[in-house]
Amino acid sequence: MPLFKLTGQGKQIDDAMRSFAEKVFASEVKDEGGRHEISPFDVDEICPISLREMQAHIFHMENLSMSMDGRRKRRFQGRKTVNLSIPQSETSSTKLSHIEEFISSSPTYESVPDFQRVQITGDYASGVTVEDFEVVCKGLYRALCIREKYMQKSFQRFPKTPSKYLRNIDGEALVAIESFYPVFTPPPKKGEDPFRREDLPANLGYHLKMKGGVIYIYPDEAAASRDEPKPYPYPNLDDFLDDMNFLLALIAQGPVKTYTHRRLKFLSSKFQVHQMLNEMDELKELKNNPHRDFYNCRKVDTHIHAAACMNQKHLLRFIKKSYHIDADRVVYSTKEKNLTLKELFAQLNMHPYDLTVDSLDVHAGRQTFQRFDKFNDKYNPVGASELRDLYLKTDNYINGEYFATIIKEVGADLVDAKYQHAEPRLSIYGRSPDEWSKLSSWFVGNRIYCPNMTWMIQVPRIYDVFRSKNFLPHFGKMLENIFLPVFEATINPQTHPDLSVFLKHITGFDSVDDESKHSGHMFSSKSPKPEEWTMENNPSYTYYAYYMYANIMVLNCLRKERGMNTFLFRPHCGEAGALTHLMTAFMIADNISHGLNLKKSPVLQYLFFLAQIPIAMSPLSNNSLFLEYAKNPFLDFLQKGLMISLSTDDPMQFHFTKEPLMEEYAIAAQVFKLSTCDMCEVARNSVLQCGISHEEKAKFLGNNYLEEGPVGNDIRRTNVAQIRMAYRYETWCYELNLIAEGLKSTE
């Protein structure tokens, strides 16, 4: 596995660096001395470094450089212009025409109409000195190497283009990265049963043992007693903490903040100029594209919770329908007796006929803004937990039959719409080891299959609740309950047939809860191991994320070996809370949901752009909970070129129509004045981001969708203009090339 060679000096984080990282963390989460270290600005017009400090810093550095050997400065003479070298893919028909006097060359593509490019000449150090520019480039280069390492170890996605630049910087040949891609279950063939069990693999006979919060795999029990695990790439906590401390220090460095802030401003301004020059040409491309428009290009709801995947009217209609059909059916059990549906409503002093969407009270309103606790109460129809247990739970007296029926109806609506897909989340809490068997029995028993749905597992971060009630002895037990059954079903599928079939339909894991809840714990080498975490306090976000990633990494290696589908780590991140959440996600998450707090860190925002980390944004959800719609950074991120998609989060709480995803697109298009090309680009991003199979993506996006840039875009399927794809790709390569040029100057 081609991991990356960092110098000894770069690899070892000295005591001063670790101390600085801890100080930065303390100022971020405890508000010590303000929050300016990591979070330099909230409004993008404010420069992260004050003008006086920056002028003094540059003056000092220039004076310092004058007294040094002038060879380095001479190397920069004549380097005022940069020639953009776009790495060529094997299937690309791109040819580059070299233009000496311009920063970026103008590539010509066979499938891209001529369009007007923005070209800028002059110095490109973006407000920092030559010496600082070299430091910035080294830091950004190492940050990208860190992400690439963790993505490849866990069979998650890292784009080809940055890999090519990183290998060019290393002076190494690019290894085909397709072998590191995740594997998703292809759709069943016509007439094939999606719940078939005949092809389950045989038992491997491996032995499993959790050690330090991570499940280790042994060939047999004898090897386990000798502590000789199979040679999988197990996680190294010390390396992770060193990388984390490096990133903490990087995002707090003044020159890095200034450079990235100015590059982001440039990206935003450049896109606006591009739109002024080429908007009509993009529209002309779309008008000449037959049988394809925004309505019939594929779009995926990349972030939606199964328990709220229906709108409030749908839920109300189902409650009334179930009462009409099953009034005398026993549906609920209390300690005293079993209740029919009629008796249950009588006990609640209500009649379904009298219910309205207002009395159902599941919609988020003004009262939920900045009140996540009140938002969670909205999952209880009419404020009654009994109705939530009956209609929105998988484990109840009727074995989740009503919930399964609602989900099937939502799936049927998606099939009718044809071009909309969803990735609902089902919950595993880690309270007991039999949760997986119950959930898989519910899924397979009710035959919950929809060609327009793929599934994910969400793990709520509520260890503190379980520990306070003495359900769990320590955090390690929670991790064991979450992951051990999945390992066992992977090793011996025939003894866990339902779970093995269920796992074929799962594409990833999510980590969910209120991010604004303060932990106060900094994950470090001094942190207790999961087996030693017996206190009632909840571990930090980073602690949760690392141990989820670590187990997913080992699990993916095992499943890849067996020819099974693998899983992505796709947590909620950046909706609220500290910026360390986003820093952790940059290291180990395939993609994230929300990402609002990226607007507070230019360094992380720029890194998310360089690595093209997908972000599922939900402006309507944010509008009810954390951020007013007009202040949502969605448009800003789109203009800069971050890979964003639109999602609904919880249609039951936030939406009104039968097609909540179209409602999300419609409102965003009106508020942000999006063009058709903008919306189709976001829709294409959602398909790339999601966990549907390679075969389906090739059908929806084109056979070359794995290629980046216009070569990988089939306008006949995506309705995204080739001019837009060429602009995005050239701009991305230009920013990566700046880093490469900055590192060349240090040689």
From Swiss-Prot:
Catalysed reaction(s) here are: AMP + H2O + H(+) = IMP + NH4(+)
Asked if the keyword Metal-binding belongs to this entry, the reply reads: yes
Q: Where are the transmembrane segments?
A: none
Phosphothreonine modified-residue sites: 81
Q: Which residues bind Zn(2+)?
A: 303, 305, 572, 649
Query: Which residues are annotated with the PTM Phosphotyrosine?
Result: 216
**What Enzyme Commission number(s) apply to this enzyme?**
3.5.4.6
Going by the UniProt record, its keywords in alphabetical order are:
Hydrolase, Metal-binding, Nucleotide metabolism, Phosphoprotein, Zinc
Q: Which residues carry this modification: Phosphoserine?
A: 85, 441
Q: In which pathway does it act?
A: Purine metabolism; IMP biosynthesis via salvage pathway; IMP from AMP: step 1/1
Active-site residue list = 594
Q: State the GO CC annotations.
A: cytosol
Q: Name one GO molecular function term.
A: metal ion binding
* UniProt cross-references to Pfam families, sorted A to Z: AMP_deaminase
**Which EC class is the enzyme in?**
hydrolase
Q: Does the keyword Secreted apply?
A: no
| Effect caused by changing residue 388 to W | Loss of AMP deaminase activity
Q: What does this protein need as cofactor?
A: Zn(2+)
- Provide one Gene Ontology biological process annotation: AMP metabolic process
**Which residues make up the binding site for substrate?**
305, 374-379, 575, 650-653
Cofactor remark: Binds 1 zinc ion per subunit.
Q: Which family is annotated? A: Belongs to the metallo-dependent hydrolases superfamily. Adenosine and AMP deaminases family.
Q: How does it assemble?
A: Homotetramer.
Task of the protein: AMP deaminase plays a critical role in energy metabolism.
Q: Which protein, by its recorded name, is this? A: AMP deaminase 1
Organism of this sequence: Rattus norvegicus
What gene, per UniProt, encodes this protein?
Ampd1
